[in-house]
From Swiss-Prot:
It holds the Pfam family NTP_transferase. It comes from Oryza sativa subsp. japonica. One of its GO terms (biological process) is protein glycosylation. It catalyses: alpha-D-mannose 1-phosphate + GTP + H(+) = GDP-alpha-D-mannose + diphosphate. This is Probable mannose-1-phosphate guanylyltransferase 1. InterPro entries: GMPPB_C, GMPPB_N, Mannose-1P_guanyltransferase, NTP_transferase_dom, Nucleotide-diphossugar_trans.
Length: 361
């Protein structure tokens, strides 16, 4: 089987992290976002993953070449010369996806994190006999999204309603699809939306079905959702693979600490924290609802909450970092400095406090 991951744009909503690497390579749960998807695809027998990309393809490929051999899966790029929306990339990668086997192929949005129940999706797609199956997830406030209206008895998709004013349902597109090769015949090589142009036509032909996604789901394309997504991901690990989580007197709730990270004495870490490879957390540090990425150092008695600390950054002694502060790569927060929602571009030194949310350039 094959899979296409829609990598797409510039990741502006996750800046300053995406100033250093393309968004799918930003660490989430101590490994690049896209690796969670590739590993799950490999588990259900996918042999080739095509990345639909228009930004820094060489960076992506160089990075993922290491994982090709480790995972035993072929990873290739399909590069857009102009943005092609969410359907155009399928037409561009047609030769890679339609291999003559007749097997369906996966299409994934690279921002989506979930438990990736791909085996169940394959079974659902086969049993319903449709041309395409989309995964949907239930949300509390459907008026913010495009809602998928479906027949509960048959799982057949009837129509799509964009940001409904009145309640028509609470299921939204989860950005995970399984499509028959015939879907490629419906798509022209031009900027096209799969959600607004292709799927409604398949639904009109009674060929589109929707599977309700079990477990958690989050689009982690922006910082606040990234932090929420981390909480949901760690909750899922607690249920499915609790041995991967840290334990001990210094741990509160769900905490993921890489085996190469060093935690000092007298720290309190958690809930909902990821500490990445090679990180050093010195004595007496307090961490909650945050990510500390590869190679970062948190000095004695610093306090970090609801924030993202970028690669190789340093948070000084007695510093306090909170309220969706995002430090880009190699940022140095000096001792006793306070950051209230600062968004700091890479390679900066912060010598004075940031008292209200602002971008530091």
């Amino acid at each position: 089987m094959k899979a296409l991951i829609l990598v797409g744009g510039f990741g502006t909503r996750l800046r300053p992290l995406t100033l250093s690497v393309p968004k799918p390579l930003v660490d989430f749960g101590n490994k690049p976002m896209i690796l969670h998807q590739i590993e799950a695809l490999k588990e259900v027998g996918v042999t080739e993953v095509v990345l639909a990309i228009n930004y820094q393809p060489e960076v992506m490929l160089n990075f993922l070449k290491d994982f090709e051999s480790k995972l035993g899966i072929k990873i290739t790029c399909s590069q857009e010369t102009e943005p092609l929306g969410t359907a155009g990339p399928l037409a561009l990668a047609r030769d890679k996806l339609a291999d003559g086997s007749g097997d369906p192929f996966f299409v994934l949005n690279s921002d989506v994190i979930s438990e990736y129940p791909f085996a169940e999706l394959i079974q659902f797609h086969k049993s319903h006999g449709g041309e395409a199956t989309i995964m949907v997830t239930k949300v509390d406030e459907p008026s913010k999204y495009g809602v998928v209206v479906m027949e509960d008895e048959t799982d057949k998709v009837e129509r799509f309603v964009e940001k409904p004013k009145v309640f028509v349902g609470n299921k939204i597109n989860a950005g995970i699809y399984l499509l028959n090769p015939s879907v490629l015949d419906r798509i022209e090589l031009k900027p096209t939306s799969i959600e607004k142009e292709v799927f409604p036509r398949i639904a009109a032909d009674n060929g589109l079905f929707a599977m309700v996604l079990p477990g958690f789901w989050m689009d982690i394309g922006q910082p606040r959702d990234y932090i929420t997504g981390l909480r949901l991901y760690l909750d899922s690990l607690r249920k499915k693979a609790p041995a991967k989580l840290a334990s001990g007197a210094h741990v509160l709730g769900n905490v993921l600490v890489h085996e190469t990270a060093v935690i000092g004495e007298g720290c309190l870490i958690g809930p909902d924290v990821a500490v990445g490879p090679g990180c050093v957390v010195e004595a007496g540090v307090r961490l909650s609802r945050c990510t500390v990425m590869r190679g970062a150092r948190v000095k004695k008695h610093a306090c970090i909450s609801s924030s993202i600390i970028g690669w190789h950054s340093t948070v000084g002694m007695w510093a306090r970092v909170e309220n969706m502060t995002i430090l880009g790569e190699d940022v140095h927060v000096c001792d006793e400095v306070y950051s209230n929602g600062g968004v700091v571009l890479p390679h900066k030194e912060i010598k004075s406090s940031i008292l209200k949310p602002e971008i530091v350039m």
